[in-house]
Amino acid sequence: MKYLLLVPILAIFILAGCAKENSIMGPQSSTNQSTSQWIKIIHSSSLSVENTYTASKSIDGSKGGTVELTKVFKDDGNWALVTAKLTIPKGAFSGTKFISYIVNTETASIDFSPADTSFSKNLNLDITFTGVNISGYKASDLIFSYLKDNSIVPAKFTYANANIAQGLLVVLGAQISHFSRFGWSTLDGPISD
């Protein structure tokens, strides 16, 4: 009789020990994937408007320069404005480069080219969206970020402000060490130094 009870009890211990949650090797590691996402500015579905604007300029690296853009556009039936200014300091790169960027008014982002270009001195970006409908977000959940190795990472900047009620997104002094996508995203985790 003892042996008849021992076999089912032993089987229960063996099966319980083989469950996924139990491991004699320690806890299983889980992969943390970024949940940050580029924001989406709300547009009326009936509106068919241009949502990207381009600015470009040939810049001599020994002299530096600026690439600027100011565009008025319709957002959710109202007039809105985007301004962007990329400042390239003297000596940021050698030779002459054709610097270009595309501002996307649907995602409050800016894509720079030539892609994957790095600099010996940081470039400086000021970008402002005024009059945009970002009512689906809380200001405390937004951060100005950039794309690094397919992950959205908080950018370094001097000043940033997201005012949902006024439809205002402002970034001053964003530091750009390489060309990638920069823009407003939802916050995922702590802000990096």
Language-model features, listed with the residues they occupy:
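Proteolytic cleavage junctions
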Residues: 19-82, 116-120, 133-193
